């Protein structure tokens, strides 16, 4: 499976507490911060919840020799 690059692009001020907790669970603390996450249903569910606050890009796995 691939990976997802998740970038925090919009402030969570004024949004529900559970959305702020979801951002923290994804490892996002500051605006414009990016993290790599595995592409699985659990992560996709979290991203669906905060889709209006983040930008998601698919990243190909690197080949390890």
UniProtKB/Swiss-Prot annotation:
Xref: Pfam families: Ribosomal_L30
GO terms under cellular component: cytosolic large ribosomal subunit
GO MF annotation terms: structural constituent of ribosome
Keywords: Ribonucleoprotein, Ribosomal protein
Biological processes per GO annotation: translation
Entry-linked HAMAP family: Ribosomal_uL30_B
Name of the featured protein: Large ribosomal subunit protein uL30
Organism: Chloroflexus aurantiacus (strain ATCC 29366 / DSM 635 / J-10-fl)
Lineage: Bacteria, Bacillati, Chloroflexota, Chloroflexia, Chloroflexales
């Amino acid at each position: 499976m691939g990976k997802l690059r998740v970038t925090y692009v919009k402030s969570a001020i004024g949004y529900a507490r559970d959305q702020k907790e979801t951002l923290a669970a994804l490892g996002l603390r500051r605006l414009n911060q990016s993290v790599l996450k595995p592409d699985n249903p659990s992560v996709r569910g979290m991203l669906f919840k905060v889709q209006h606050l983040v930008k998601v890009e698919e990243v190909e796995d690197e080949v390890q020799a």
